[in-house]
Amino acid sequence: MAYSTDGSSHAGGIRNEKQLKEYLQKGAAQTLYPSLSESFEVIKRGGTQFKQDLEISDGDSKILISAKKKTDINDGSFDWLNSSSAMKESESLKQFAQTVKMVGKTSPPYCTAKLAVLNASHKAIATITSEDLKSILEKHVAKKNENMKIMITETSTGKNWEYSFNESPLYHSIKNHTPDIILERGIDSARVLFSDDNDNVLDHGLRVRVVTNNGIGALIGTSKANKTSIGVLKFQQDNIPKLIKGLAGKIRNF
């Protein structure tokens, strides 16, 4: 599956956050959270300082919101994590990041650079341990989202969904079950499944990607859109309809 390295996904997300902010401020927030006073305020956050995209402030009370946007929820995925800092927490990922840096320094032809990065990516995914995977998921996905309200917007229909991340099956599995990488046809990505104490296999639609943030062209200096590119770890949510169905009564439309 192709993914954007030109900044268009980020720009689209910013537009969605602005529209969602206005929608919540005009009354949707009080419908979701009836205890809010008349003086509540929806504040734009995001950037490098905040995990939450939006924040509802009402006196001493705060509601943290992670906003996810899809044109069609039946197509594509959204990110739980897109981080270069997480690369430091596994020897396999460190080696991938070092390979990316080396390719950037030597600036070989595009195809040579792409092949080197893809090979390093596949090796990293194939060799990361279950222990490292669980540690990264706990630190960078569960902990950073456990107090978050997740809001999914489908722009083609105008539908919105809201749920608490700490009530989700994914959060429960990250905290209590064993994650495993399932290698398939993808070179730089794989599914992440979980096993419980009874050896039941649980699929929450989680995918891991080990890639560069701005693509190969930026890495070797041939891109006009970006001048640098580094190794990043992504966890993505596939199969959004299944996610919504699995939450059952814990998710609501607004």
Show the residue positions of the predicted features.
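Non-Sec secretion/translocation targeting segments of pathogen effectors
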Residues: 1-2, 254
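Catalytic cores of nucleic-acid endonucleases
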Residues: 3-11, 18, 26-28, 60-225, ...
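Active-site nucleophile-adjacent alpha helix/oxyanion-hole segment immediately C-terminal to the catalytic cysteine
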Residues: 23
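A short acidic/basic microdomain associated with nuclease active sites
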Residues: 26-59
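Protruding loop/beta-arch "assembly-hinge" segments enriched in small, turn-prone residues
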Residues: 225-254
